Amino acid sequence: MTEQFRTEKDSMGEFQVPIDAKYGASTARAVENFPISNLRFSRSFIKALGEIKKACAKVNQNNKLLNKNFAESIIDAAQQVIDGDYDKDFVVDIFQTGSGTSTNMNANEIISKIASESLSENIHPNDHVNMSQSSNDVIPTATNVAAVTEIVEKLIPNVESLIQSLEEKANYMHEIGRASCRERV
């Protein structure tokens, strides 16, 4: 079975995108241009991107830069990204040129597509989803949020578990007396 495509158009022209993909032309172009490692971003990083896009949509609505319907659709779509519903559509290699623009656009296009489908209106990836944002801010912020999340949710609990195991082992060893490398009775 051959893969089917749709034609997407952006500021750089038309591009063929897999028909079921939630991303658009910019992401598909980045995948073609930067096939470096086949490594993808972590769940915590994608979640952080969704949280940033959601927060920005709320702020843009509060500042009357984004109408309520668009904002709510973007917020709902970003929540789906946060929940991990579209991780498979984050296809840009972690190694790419620039300041993560391709990754930022990957998120913008996914959220735009989901929001546009739910609202039946055209929510633009740059003009609406990425409003008041720059890749130079979004990507480092997502990196920091993801790092803190990993530290709090994974590293600290594992270190605490290790400490507890070592304390138990130390207490056990302390109770055992040794004489000539044998346990004492």
Show where each model-derived region lies:
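Conserved, well-structured ligand/cofactor-binding cores
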Residues: M1-R184
